[in-house]
């Protein structure tokens, strides 16, 4: 087996995820995904396929899951947007977002990728994307070694190339999540720096793919 040792970046949050089906089209709801940056209760609204809509909202780490998923509690939270007359609850669950990377991604003929190798908060939508990048990096290397007699050292580049990139994405995602959860706090806003022309600049993820 591969060593279970992990790097923990210390970010862990509970979020409720509520999927609903609208009984009829509600023109008052946004026709796009929106992130509500609130110090009290950060939330996300997703305009999904057809009449499906999703709300996600941050929970206190000491909250009781069973109580949070009570329908009355859910509708109370959603009351600023919709009521039970507008939609039915299709699914309700709680996710715990974590920030972890396995220290070893290979042992002999066994490799790990995706969620088996790393876990990221969802704020940049890069969890599954990173897993796809893992496989895209690895599959052709295995094929070259098995079918064309390439030296095994090629396989060693999988972990060295992917781990650094995933790490940078996770760190950036954590910072994004902290911003969403602290918006309006001067401790956060004062850290935003402007260019000389007054514009704000975001640099690319490093190291590159």
Where in this protein do the model-derived segments appear?
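Conserved FAD-binding catalytic core of PHBH/FMO-like flavoproteins
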Residues: 1-97
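Surface-exposed loop/turn and secondary-structure junction residues enriched for glycine/proline
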Residues: 9, 23, 36-39, 48-49, ...
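Conserved mid-domain beta->alpha element of the FAD-binding
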Residues: 89, 95-175
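Hydrophobic transmembrane alpha-helix bundles
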Residues: 47-56, 88-92, 124-130, 186-199, ...
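Residue-level detector of alpha-helical recognition elements and their boundaries
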Residues: 21, 33, 60, 93, ...
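Charge-rich, low-complexity amphipathic helices
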Residues: 20-24, 28, 40, 67, ...
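Helical substrate-recognition/capping region of FAD-dependent monooxygenase/halogenase enzymes
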Residues: 76, 144-209
